[in-house]
Design a protein with these regions (language model features):
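Beta-sheet-dominated scaffold domains
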Residues: 83-86, 248, 254, 262, ...
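Basic/aromatic-rich interaction segments and small domains that mediate binding to polyanionic partners
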Residues: 49-56
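Surface-exposed loop and turn segments in beta-propeller and other repeat-based domains
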Residues: 68-73, 224, 275-297
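Beta-propeller domains
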Residues: 1-18, 258-287, 322-331
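Glycine-rich, histidine-containing beta strand-loop boundary motifs that form or position
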Residues: 2, 40, 95-97, 106, ...
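Beta-propeller fold recognition
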Residues: 96-97, 101-128, 255-257, 269, ...
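Flexible, glycine-rich phosphate/dinucleotide-binding loops
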Residues: 52, 102, 163, 206-208, ...
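Disordered, low-complexity "stalk" and linker segments at domain junctions of extracellular
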Residues: 4-46, 58-252, 286
Length: 365
């Protein structure tokens, strides 16, 4: 249930209630979602905090009493509720509104719900302390005039092998690694949460993939970099007033957003197999995030995104079908958009019945 700046929860025809929290203590560090009692009022922790005495609206949300109805803070006012769009995936509800950054409402227990803005950046920090040392056999008669600069960057990778950090600061060294036995050794500091590291080498103004390791050292003994794979570039287009999406859904293992005030006919898809990874490389790869604009005669905000056999986008004046130019999955280079009809939809959330879409037509009311 969504109301004026609150969420309430119901299951099997019953409203959820909470138990009184322990007395608030200035020596306790509270996690988001914790309940503490102060001056006979129970408070829901909106942030991770300590020594922040309730009532403090930045950190605490007062809960109803008599009865103890469980509710949490919502960023949406009563006037905004009919324009909130949402999609559910298991215990995660994604909510969007053009006035607010995209949010996730997550269920951790019957009375443990948390709403937070979505972080579209990398979950890993970029490696630090990157350095490179050179070695060339002392018996080599090669002149230092033949030495060239070799520049490297490193990224951290999670155990899913998909989430990758931004590239580190670069480190370089001069050497002639074409000589037998010559090598460059790249080292860096470990990153919390990383299971592997990828090293990239510069050539022609771009960094190409050199190698991958589970340690914090890699040796380059004249390895040819692969420029089909480059360090990821993370972008978050949903920052600032006018840049928040008003529509959301899922399609082909991507979370899909659309319809900001500043780009009403743009659509964004996360990196394949991820929920919030908006990274891409140069050159573009098939699993990179997708961003495109629907070119149409009339500029109408995308109000709804509906996944069927094809992805459907509903605006106030038309319906659009998003497909691939071939029979494969949608990729950044294969995406195709065609008009389906010219009816238009209003703001009411569409409903899928079997394999059909039911939506309320836009009638100007």
């Amino acid at each position: 249930e969504m109301g004026d700046y609150y969420f309430r929860f119901h299951t099997q025809g019953q409203t959820l209630f909470y138990n009184d929290g322990a007395a608030w203590s200035n020596s306790t560090t509270y996690a988001i979602g914790d309940i503490a009692k102060h001056n006979n009022v129970n408070y829901y922790a909106r942030t991770i905090n300590s020594n922040q005495q309730p009532p403090n609206a930045t950190h605490w949300y007062p809960l109803p009493t008599n009865p103890n109805i469980y509710e949490i803070y919502s960023p949406y006012s009563e006037a905004e509720l009919f324009d909130v769009n949402y999609v559910q995936s298991a215990d995660v509800l994604t909510t969007v509104h053009p006035n607010h950054a995209p949010n996730e409402l997550r269920r951790y227990g019957a009375t443990k719900w948390i709403i937070q803005s979505i972080d579209f950046g990398s979950p890993l920090a970029a490696p630090t302390g990157v350095s490179v040392s050179m070695y060339i056999p002392s018996s080599t008669s090669t002149s230092t005039d033949t030495y060239v600069d070799h520049e490297y960057v490193v990224t951290a990778v999670k155990d899913n092998l998909v989430d990758e950090s931004n590239q580190s600061s670069s480190a370089s060294v001069s050497n002639n690694i074409f000589v037998t036995g010559a090598k460059n050794t790249i080292t860096w500091n470990a990153v919390s949460g990383a299971s592997r590291y990828r090293v990239y080498k510069a050539q022609g103004g771009i960094f190409g993939f050199l190698g991958e390791t589970t340690t914090t050292t890699l040796v380059d003994d004249n390895i040819a970099p692969d420029f089909a794979k480059t360090p990821p570039i993370h972008e978050n287009d949903f920052v600032g007033t006018g840049n928040y999406p008003g529509a959301v859904s899922y399609f082909e293992q991507r979370r899909v957003f659309a319809g900001t005030n500043n780009a009403p006919q743009n659509i964004w898809m996360t990196k394949s197999g991820t929920e919030s990874n908006m990274s891409f490389g140069i050159p573009i790869r098939d699993d990179d995030r997708i961003e495109f604009r629907v070119a149409a005669r009339e500029a109408n905000t995308i109000r709804h995104i509906v996944p069927l056999t094809n992805l459907l986008m509903l605006t106030g004046s038309a319906e659009w079908r998003v497909t691939s130019v071939n029979s494969d999955a949608i990729t950044p280079t294969s995406i195709s958009v065609k008009p389906q009809s010219y009816v238009g939809a209003n703001n009411a959330q569409p409903v899928i019945v079997n394999n059909s879409l039911v939506y309320a037509a836009a009638r100007g009311g």
